[in-house]
Structure formats: structure tokens, C-alpha cells
Regions:
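Glycine-rich FAD pyrophosphate-binding loop
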Residues: 1-5
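Short secondary-structure boundary/capping segments
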Residues: 6-10, 200-204, 322-323
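Conserved beta-strand scaffold positions in the cores of enzyme catalytic domains, especially
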Residues: 74, 80, 154, 286, ...
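Residues forming anionic-ligand binding surfaces in small-molecule and nucleic-acid pockets
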Residues: 112-124
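FAD/FMN-dependent oxidoreductases across multiple families
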Residues: 248, 258-368
Length: 474
């Protein structure tokens, strides 16, 4: 479904919905906690910023003075207006920098040494949204085990042929051992092979290559440090960026780059120069994989739905691939199964929604690249003029106001745009000042700014160390 080992809070929520405990994933899949993403050196200045997940405890400030009718967090507006770093008022960033997770021990349980009998997670109070990092191979195997335990039949084999009925619906799969599997509905999860959606149905591909040029990645592993980070790190490189994902026993890393500017050999050389040593590569030839940013315009055709890499892939910067898959599954199963045979309107709605989601993701990814750096041909590609039209319109609006809910749609919050935009000065300090000077709600945020900074620091001290949290749930 995805190319990496990270995800968004949708995955953690989805596992919770499926009654797969977080402790199970920590025990069996080398899982760690993800509070958000740390973007390092994207302005070529050695600095960093975060796109953190939201808090769930309103006392922490972002929501305490931010109700449904306000377009953006007054505390974020205050930090920009004061020329202060957003990181000083972002609780999830603070706990990430302290190698902590947004969980506190319940007072009575801490005082009396209470140990829950049901699940160790019950000993903690969650005060922020999280996702997980995971060993992809171990997670796939664990989900297969759980599926078998719950009655799912697993057939191991390689598909040799896909047969269609007179209406062009998939009615059977033939394996290499000539075993035949009768089908009434099919999910194409064949990854970049796109076995059915691409090779059988020849669906139309919508490419983002014109404005998202990265198309290759070289994965590698490095050793874990004493402290386990509670975030994914995205480190800007000369011709792309490097992901660094902490598992319990190692970091999973990779260099995502533009192959029109450097070769695979040059990418490997840049990796080793950056690290100062040769890391462990999954492949002996130090090779990687290629991909094309885009999505199918019709991921659902007849009785086949493509999910994950088979349907779309933008790039792994915001760990969106599994997120899109979960949203797709959720939309499919909102409909009664007996409608699937004659479901043209349902299919059209699904396809429209998934393409719209991928378009939104591609815009948000491009926005990350609109940095202040211009040291290589790669970074010079990401100008306002080359941006998607809808993104240009958003940026034009942000010259006179802060990002709002109407900009965000259902996929990104206005805070998400502000986190990224404030890092490379797309969000204007004078605009934020105008909000505070002319709005009582935003002035309230500014007046309470110092209080919330101090209160958040206090709450950070109450949160649990990441490694201790993982050990406690094993």
C-alpha cells in the first residue's frame, strides 16, 4: 500500500477501529510513536520546523482560544506577528524535541503503581494525536496473522491471468500453478505492477510530473541512537530530500531525488558524503526504485478498486499513501455491498473524491518545496510560476489574510498550511499583526501567548519518555 515505514494518525485510528492494540504493534512490528514530521535545512540555513499532529487536550492552547468559527489558531498568528518561531507555541514539536510522546500517566495510577489488566495503554492519558512508524515487512506479516485468526483465507501465489465476463467485470484469477480463484469483487493492491487497473483496464493516468519532479529513491538503514526520536525527519538535500524514520532497533532512511539531475550512483555518493560513512543498503548493488508522481483518474472500474501504490503515489514526504488507502476503504464500505454490481454513480463519486484528495496532496507537497533556498537547479524549479493554479490562488489570498478553513478543504487544516508557510515566509508577519489588531479573538490569543508557552513547558515535563513508553507497552 505504501513505500515507506511511516503514516498519519489515520492509520493509528484505523487500527484502533479494527481492535488491533497499539501494544501489539509495538511488540510485533518494531513500532514507535510519530508526533509529526521535522523538516531540517529546507531553507539551507541549518534550521528546522515541524508539521506536528494536533493536540487533543484543549488546555494546551491551540484549541482553547480557537473555536469552530475562527480560521486559524490565534496562538500561531501571535507567534508570527511577534516574529517568534511557531515552534515556541507548538506543543507537539516541544515534546518531540524532548524525545517524548503525548501521553501522561494518570495521577492515581502513577501514585499507587497501578497496572491495568486489560492493556498497558490504559495506564496513560493521551493528550495529542499520534501515528506510528513500523517495520513494513513485520507489519504485513502481523496483519496477515490477524486476518487468518479472524477467518480470512490467505492464498499464496503469483497471478498468471485475469479473466473478464461479457460486461468487462473481473470474474476470475488464474495462478501460476493453474489454481483458479472465482471473483465477485477485487482490490488491486499489486503496487507499482498495477496488474489489473493498469494492465487489464488500461486506466487513464493523471501525472504530477510537471510540478513534482522527484521520481527515484535509494533506501538504506542506519543504527539507532540511545534516544528514539518520536518524529519522522525529512532532511533537505541538494537534489531532493532524505527521510529518516526511527524504529526500535534502527532508522529506516532513503534519499528521494530528481533523476533528471543526478544518477543513482551520484545519489549514493551524496548519501555517504552526508553521513560520513557507508550505511547498510537493502540491496547489494545499493540500488533503489523509481516512481511516477500521479494517480489514476478512475481507481474504481467495474468491480475492481485499486488501492495504495497500484492507484496513486505522489511521494513519501507527508506519508500520505496509506492515508489515501484508508480513506478509500472507508468510502467504499459506507455503501451496501449489494450495490457494487451496478454502482456507476457510487464509482463516479469515489473516483472524484480520491482524485481530488491526490490533487490536494500534490499541492501541499509542492508548497513544502517553495523554500528560501536556491543553491541548485532542483530547488530553483519550485517557483510560484510553476505551482499548480489552485495553489497560486491560495498564495495570492495569503498576501492579505491567513490560511482559512475554506482554503483547506477536508484534507489539510489551516494550521497545516501555516506550519509550512511560516517556515519559508509565505505567511506574512504584517497580515498576522492585522488579525491581532482588529479581532478580539486573535488579540486574546496574543494576550495569552506567554501564559500558554509556559503552561505547555509544564505539560512537556509531565509527558512520558518515548523509549520508556515503548518498553512499558511491550
Amino acid at each position: 500500500l505504501g513505500a515507506g515505514e511511516g503514516s498519519t494518525p489515520y492509520l493509528a485510528d484505523f487500527f484502533d477501529h479494527l481492535n488491533i492494540p497499539l501494544s501489539d504493534l509495538i511488540k510485533n512490528c518494531d513500532a514507535t510513536i510519530k508526533n509529526g514530521i521535522k523538516f531540517t535545512n529546507w531553507n539551507n540555513d541549518g534550521e528546522f520546523y515541524y508539521h506536528g499532529f494536533s493536540t487533543t487536550d484543549k488546555s494546551l492552547g491551540f484549541d482553547a482560544v480557537y473555536d469552530r468559527y475562527l480560521s486559524n489558531s490565534p496562538l500561531m498568528a501571535a507567534s508570527i506577528a511577534l516574529n517568534d518561531s511557531v515552534k515556541k507555541i507548538d506543543f507537539m514539536e516541544k515534546i518531540s524535541e524532548a524525545n517524548k510522546v503525548p501521553f501522561t500517566l494518570e495521577a492515581n495510577k502513577r501514585d499507587f503503581g497501578f497496572v491495568s489488566k486489560k492493556d498497558p495503554i490504559d495506564d496513560y492519558k493521551k493528550i495529542g494525536n499520534i501515528s506510528i512508524h513500523f517495520n513494513a515487512t513485520k507489519l504485513a506479516n502481523r496483519l496477515k496473522e490477524i486476518g487468518k485468526e479472524r477467518g480470512i483465507k490467505v492464498v499464496d501465489g503469483t497471478i498468471k491471468n485475469v479473466s473478464l465476463d461479457k460486461d468487462n467485470y473481473v470474474n476470475g484469477l488464474t495462478l501460476e500453478n493453474d489454481e483458479k480463484i472465482v471473483c465477485d469483487f477485487v482490490f488491486d493492491c499489486s503496487g507499482f505492477h498495477r496488474l489489473i487497473i493498469g494492465k487489464v483496464y488500461d486506466a487513464k493516468w493523471k501525472s504530477y510530473k510537471d510540478f513534482l519532479p522527484v521520481d527515484s529513491a535509494v533506501p538504506f538503514f542506519v543504527e539507532m541512537t540511545d534516544k528514539i526520536p518520536s518524529y519522522t525527519e525529512a532532511i533537505a538535500m541538494k537534489y531532493g530530500w532524505m527521510w529518516k524514520i526511527p524504529l526500535q532497533n534502527r532508522f529506516g532512511c532513503g534519499y528521494v531525488y530528481d533523476s533528471s539531475l543526478i544518477s543513482e550512483e551520484e545519489a549514493v555518493k551524496e548519501i555517504e558524503e552526508f553521513l560520513g560513512y557507508e550505511p547498510t543498503y537493502p540491496r547489494k548493488d545499493k540500488g533503489g526504485f523509481k516512481f511516477s508522481a500521479g494517480c489514476y483518474e478512475e481507481p474504481w472500474i467495474n468491480n475492481c478498486v485499486a488501492l495504495g501504490l497500484a492507484a496513486n503515489f505522489v511521494e513519501p514526504l507527508e506519508a500520505t499513501s496509506i492515508w489515501v488507502s484508508i480513506v478509500g476503504l472507508t468510502q467504499i464500505f459506507e455503501n451496501p455491498l449489494w450495490l457494487f454490481k451496478n454502482s456507476k454513480d457510487i464509482r463516479q463519486e469515489f473516483n472524484k473524491n480520491i482524485v481530488s484528495m491526490n490533487n490536494s496532496i500534490s499541492e501541499f507537497i509542492y508548497f513544502h518545496y517553495m523554500t528560501l533556498r536556491n543553491d541548485t537547479e532542483f530547488w530553483n524549479k519550485f517557483s510560484y510560476e510553476n505551482a499548480p493554479k489552485d495553489l497560486q490562488e491560495k498564495i495570492n489570498k495569503w498576501k492579505v489574510r491567513l490560511p482559512s478553513k475554506s482554503d483547506s478543504g477536508e484534507h489539510w487544516t489551516s494550521n497545516s498550511w501555516t506550519f509550512v508557510g511560516s517556515a519559508h515566509d509565505t505567511i506574512n508577519k504584517d497580515v498576522a499583526k492585522a488579525y491581532i489588531e482588529n479581532s478580539a479573538d486573535y488579540k486574546k490569543g496574543a494576550d495569552m501567548y506567554d501564559y500558554y508557552k509556559k503552561y505547555q513547558d509544564y505539560k512537556v515535563s509531565e509527558c512520558v519518555d518515548h523509549r520508556q513508553f515503548l518498553e512499558g507497552l511491550k
